[in-house]
Regions:
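Acyl/amide activation-and-transfer machinery of modular secondary-metabolite enzymes
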Residues: 156-166
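Conserved alpha/beta catalytic core and glycan-binding cleft of carbohydrate-active enzymes
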Residues: 10, 14-141, 145-146, 150
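Active-site groove signature of glycoside hydrolases
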Residues: 1-4
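Short histidine-centered catalytic/ligand-binding loop motif
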Residues: 114-115, 165-171
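Catalytic cores of secreted or luminal carbohydrate-active enzymes
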Residues: 171-183
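Reverse-transcriptase-like RNA-dependent polymerase core
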Residues: 152-154
Length: 183
């Protein structure tokens, strides 16, 4: 929630940390309920989560998206988001909100607990694009075995949905292996 701190405070934090550890890696979640500062972080040493990448990939794997935007994201979002390659933290799922498989599930209720073959193919396409894109790929715990929160978006106090179901690792071993090959 770096936006709450603001760019000037983030610059101060960066300067202080780099005095102690010059090669420190700094990553920001560039938004809050008030706004978004990813573009402003472009001229700092901070990398940030690329939510534009996340949103585009969700649409692209469903057949919506154009080649120019795909090229932009494959190149690491260079014109607005990132000045240098590692500044773009490319992701399609994080700890918050619904999981990737719930978001792209064919089921109308958005529950990806029982993914279709198409859902799995879309996930493999996303993984290939994520790992070949310029920038830093970020995957969420369990994303490689199609973790589902049963379509629930806000699981802040839902340990039953936030816990990893490792039985899915066996059930979706080929998807896990596909991610592992890219890594």
């Amino acid at each position: 929630l770096a936006e709450l701190l603001g760019v000037e405070v983030l610059r101060e934090v960066e300067a202080a940390l780099k005095r102690v550890k010059p090669d420190v890696i700094l990553i920001a979640e560039p938004w809050s309920f008030r706004g978004h500062i990813a573009g402003a972080l472009r001229d700092t040493g901070w990398a940030s989560w690329n939510d534009g990448y996340r949103d585009f990939m969700k649409d692209y794997v469903r057949g919506n998206g154009d080649g120019r935007r795909m090229e932009y994201f494959l190149r690491g979002s260079p014109w607005y988001f990132a000045k240098w390659p590692a500044q773009s933290i490319n992701y399609t799922e994080s700890h918050d909100d619904r999981t990737w498989i719930d978001v792209i599930a064919e089921r109308e209720d958005g529950n990806g607990h029982v993914p279709t073959a198409h859902d799995r193919r879309r996930t493999h396409l996303m993984a290939a694009l994520l790992f070949m894109s310029v920038g830093v790929p970020m995957i969420s715990a369990g994303q490689d075995f199609l973790r589902s929160k049963h379509g629930v978006a806000n699981t802040y106090q839902r340990a039953d949905l936030n816990a990893l179901d490792y039985r899915r690792l066996r059930r979706f071993a080929s998807t896990h292996a596909y991610f592992a090959e890219w890594i």
